[in-house]
């Protein structure tokens, strides 16, 4: 699991650090604002402890005889035999927790438009970013740097544009101009894809194809656009610290720079090895989230992943993560392990809103799933 979150009393939080965090936040310019100001060394609020960085600078290479599951499977959705697709998804979700999708039906012009739009927004007029800057997690459209800025032991070197695409999307005219004609269309395309993936996952559990959909696992879609500016001291910080995703699953779109690292082997937890995942042009990546691990009683695996700080001297890295979950504001449904006569439940039932509230409280330094294990 990820390290336990430090509290304000024991993590070095003090008046001076709090002032530094607040001063950074008050600019409403994020990490890109620091880069634009010409910083040659990163502020101390971004310094991660040496033990957290010791294996991120040079992750372990894949061994010559990799552990079981030590590769990211590729699922080709043009395969006509549904049984083959179901078996591929079952294996990937139950071992690696990640898999590529190719021939997935999301148009390249939509994917390219999203990546360009995210880059143009972050590299465009600062007034557009400042107008959206907020730490109000209830807002369906907001820009910020580090959602857990005031909770984490150290900040990460990235900026984020958040958009709730379903069920409460913002009016199109409120979207940033570079994304106005692509965000909602991309959201619709990945939602259609997600419905099909949920069918395959349901069938791989031996359930009817609409089982997970009827459990309301995809009522909510949050599209989270990450921007990783070049870092003058990448050996002191990270782009995203190691974590697992809290929802049901994520569909990830990346640019060609790479940077994603996944913990493979030993079910993606402590003891596995960190592996660089090279980009795959035209492909989308799916990773299982914590709530799906919970409802499948560990049959599917939510695996740790991270992003090192951007070592490029002049080019930012961009990615777009589509997080699928239930409607946490309205749903009263209790989520617990699907009954299995061969295995006792490993988790207690929980409302999704309470699960996400725990995630938001502890931030990326901890893992919400562990708090619900029996």
Swiss-Prot record:
- Keyword Metal-binding appears in the UniProt entry: yes
| GO molecular function terms noted in the UniProt entry | 2-oxoglutarate-dependent dioxygenase activity; DIBOA-glucoside oxygenase activity; metal ion binding
So what does this thing catalyse?
DIBOA beta-D-glucoside + 2-oxoglutarate + O2 = TRIBOA beta-D-glucoside + succinate + CO2
| pH dependence of function | Optimum pH is 6.0.
Q: Which InterPro entries match?
A: DIOX_N (IPR026992), IPNS-like_FE2OG_OXY (IPR044861), IPNS-like_sf (IPR027443), Oxoglu/Fe-dep_dioxygenase_dom (IPR005123)
What the record says about disrupting the gene is:
Loss of DIMBOA biosynthesis.
Keywords of the record = Cytoplasm, Dioxygenase, Iron, Metal-binding, Oxidoreductase
Sorted alphabetically, the Gene Ontology cellular component annotations on this record are: cytoplasm
Q: Which amino acids does the record list as binding Fe cation?
A: 243, 245, 305
Q: Which family does it belong to?
A: Belongs to the iron/ascorbate-dependent oxidoreductase family.
**Cofactor binding note:** Binds 1 Fe(2+) ion per subunit.
Q: Where would you find this protein in the cell?
A: Cytoplasm
Q: Which PROSITE patterns match?
A: FE2OG_OXY (PS51471)
What is its biological role? Can use 2,4-dihydroxy-2H-1,4-benzoxazin-3(4H)-one 2-D-glucoside (DIBOA-glucoside) as substrate, but not aglucone DIBOA.
Q: Which organism is it from?
A: Zea mays
Location of the Fe2OG dioxygenase domain: 214-326
Give the SUPFAM superfamilies listed for this entry. Clavaminate synthase-like
Task: Write out the residues that bind 2-oxoglutarate.
Answer: 228, 317, 319
This one is known as DIBOA-glucoside dioxygenase BX6
Q: Which top-rank group of organisms is this from?
A: Eukaryota
Residues forming coiled coils: none
Q: Which cofactor does it need?
A: L-ascorbate; Fe(2+)
Q: Where is it made, tissue-wise?
A: Expressed in seedlings and newly formed crown roots. Highest expression in the scutellar node. Low to non detectable levels in cob, tassel and mature organs like husk or leaves.
Entry's EC annotation: 1.14.11.59
**Where would you say this protein principally sits, based on its record?**
cytoplasm
